[in-house]
């Protein structure tokens, strides 16, 4: 009888191993601090005891912590539902928020809009759905260096998790245009968001991040 040699099993590709190692390093050095800073910054703008819709919530971890601090009733929506989430999550089509006009106290986007093809359209949807506030954490890109830095940050933080990366960054002027077109009044626009420890903050901080609280202006 002729023995058949077993074919060697293909192991993980070098690129996949590199991305996983990079993701673990990012999580260890940056993720915990990022969560803490974001929760503090966002909770300052969420109506106490209100209702919060978190768009692009992922596993809902940050939204859950914000709700715990503010007493808000929170629910998330996303284009896909993860097996385990920290909050209830509904699916949506990525374009129309599945809620009625002025049906929740606040709508939040946490590093979501730059992953979408048309941030302005989603901002208009948030203005329609939110009664009191639209809260946005995202990036500012004013020049080629900003764009390159944000691309690198996005790749390191998201590529290991298979996140789609359109690198759709906007300048402050573009964000303000989107807010105005949606009928949103800027109540706060904070660019001092200390997500990174020194010396990383000198490269990856420097005004590349913002947290904004916007108020829907009805009847204009």
Q: Where are the regions that the model predicts?
A:
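A short, conserved alpha-helix within the catalytic core of class I
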Residues: 116-125
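Class I SAM-dependent methyltransferase SAM/SAH-binding core
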Residues: 59-96
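Conserved beta-strand signature within the Rossmann-like core of class I S-adenosyl-L-methionine
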Residues: 132-139
């Amino acid at each position: 009888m002729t023995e058949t040699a077993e074919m060697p099993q293909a192991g993980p590709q070098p690129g996949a191993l590199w991305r996983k190692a990079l993701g673990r390093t990012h999580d260890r050095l940056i993720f915990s601090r990022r969560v803490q800073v974001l929760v503090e910054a966002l909770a300052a703008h969420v109506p106490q005891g209100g209702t919060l819709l978190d768009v692009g919530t992922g596993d809902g971890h940050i939204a859950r912590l914000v709700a715990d601090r503010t007493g808000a009733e929170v629910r998330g929506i996303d284009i896909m539902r993860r097996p385990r989430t920290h909050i209830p999550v509904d699916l949506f089509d990525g374009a129309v928020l599945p809620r009625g006009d002025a049906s929740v106290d606040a709508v939040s986007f946490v590093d979501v809009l730059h992953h979408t093809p048309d941030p302005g359209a989603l901002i208009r949807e948030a203005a329609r759905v939110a009664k009191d506030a639209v809260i946005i954490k995202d990036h500012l890109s004013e020049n080629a260096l900003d764009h390159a830095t944000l691309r690198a940050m996005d790749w390191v933080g998201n590529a290991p998790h298979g996140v789609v990366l359109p690198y759709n960054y906007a300048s402050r002027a573009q964000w303000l245009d989107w807010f105005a077109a949606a009928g949103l009044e800027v109540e706060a626009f904070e660019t001092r968001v200390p997500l990174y420890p020194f010396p990383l903050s000198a490269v990856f901080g420097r005004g590349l991040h913002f947290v904004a609280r916007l108020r829907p202006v009805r009847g204009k």
